[in-house]
Amino acid sequence: MKLYNLKDHNEQVSFAQAVTQGLGKNQGLFFPHDLPEFSLTEIDEMLKLDFVTRSAKILSAFIGDEIPQEILEERVRAAFAFPAPVANVESDVGCLELFHGPTLAFKDFGGRFMAQMLTHIAGDKPVTILTATSGDTGAAVAHAFYGLPNVKVVILYPRGKISPLQEKLFCTLGGNIETVAIDGDFDACQALVKQAFDDEELKVALGLNSANSINISRLLAQICYYFEAVAQLPQEARNQLVVSVPSGNFGDLTAGLLAKSLGLPVKHFIAATNVNDTVPRFLHDGQWSPKATQATLSNAMDVSQPNNWPRVEELFRRKIWQLKELGYAAVDDETTQQTMRELKELGYTSEPHAAVAYRALRDQLHPGEYGLFLGTAHPAKFKESVEAILGETLDLPKELAERADLPLLSHNLPADFAALRKLMMNHQ
């Protein structure tokens, strides 16, 4: 597999290099040189396969012979050890539930596949994973790499800005997992990660790698569950499918669009954000004008500078698709709460991120179409807000209950690169 740097097309790397480096020169994102396509017949045959076999086939179309098919399938089996069911919400709407993994969030798919790829590629060489999280990435990455040999993980998150339960899920592990609470917002955490990757000495000394959705292995893994969703739908739904994606860093939407590029029958995608609406405003008036990030109920989408957006634009350019074909919506907290109550009346308990996606979908779905929205996290991960909004008590899944009373093992740091650098060098 060959990939190129979106900021410098002359920088071309293999899949192994892209996974290991994370980012290219000048913080450029890597993008596949070849965009494989399956025929309609091939797609129909693939949709009959089981999740793991089909996923290995999809991933192999990108990765090629860099990783033998047998090993790839084995690694996919280890990564995707849980289902991605479509729950029936209304006669014309389903929710693709991506929260049945160990940390109850969609990022388990990408995090675990990346961990499998990195450990396969690195062999015995030590690696340090440095990533920023607004919640779910931290937990997924921590659990995906926890206890794996030759890997150290450093996770930055905005202090006081993620739910207490989310914090417990990844800040209580210890071992090879180091968690750092930063005085600042998610964008401040992202900025520190970028500074670290610009520091050549630090990069080489620690074998730095990033594990957020910019890593190509995570992005490729996310393509697979779109196929799994379609495989569960009846033929008439497949023919008129509209997918609404709750969007923060836009990795999930990028993966969905790559699935469509492979030949998956999706009529239309909707990018659903909260009031951090840089992309909806851009799609509306063509002006890219990020505003200060605002805290919302759907906190994993509190991102005003989505770092996967260049990949979306590149895919549209390569496929000669029109950006105006992409649906969009920005949903405020009041509407999010109202939507969660509406979903509850339909018999479906949801959380803020999925509610944003459902609202955008319901408002834009036409008669005869089938709508799918992504459920990216278990409602219990947002227990306090969900209970307050719905006026009922949620049972804690065992994954959360087991960690609820454990002590936090995080360091507190200012949003200052020198302080972070010192901590990382001291904790090699």
Where do the model's predicted regions map?
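PLP-dependent amino-acid enzyme catalytic core
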Residues: M1-Q428
